[in-house]
């Protein structure tokens, strides 16, 4: 089980790493890692909403929680209990990151522009603060 504190720390570290990749012109990698920032923030928020001390990690821990075993940001937002708030108050940021999925790792380098990567990382940073303060 990953504790809420560990989830928050992981999101923070991924955001720092994504910003570093962005500064180094590694735009595709920045977005790929930036998506995990949002995923972790959503999972921490979900734990808070459900009053869980942590989020399942192993197959055994997920045994009774298969619907929570996802990287789909839309699903995680719905499960987090703050979908209406996020989509109402942060629609631009949400639309910017909502397309993300781990399959982006297969994109060819150079697919993402600097401007798009910067917008994504900025949106991920805002959502991390909102979801997991």
Cite the ranges covered by each PLM segment.
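Terminal alpha-helical segments
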Residues: 1-133
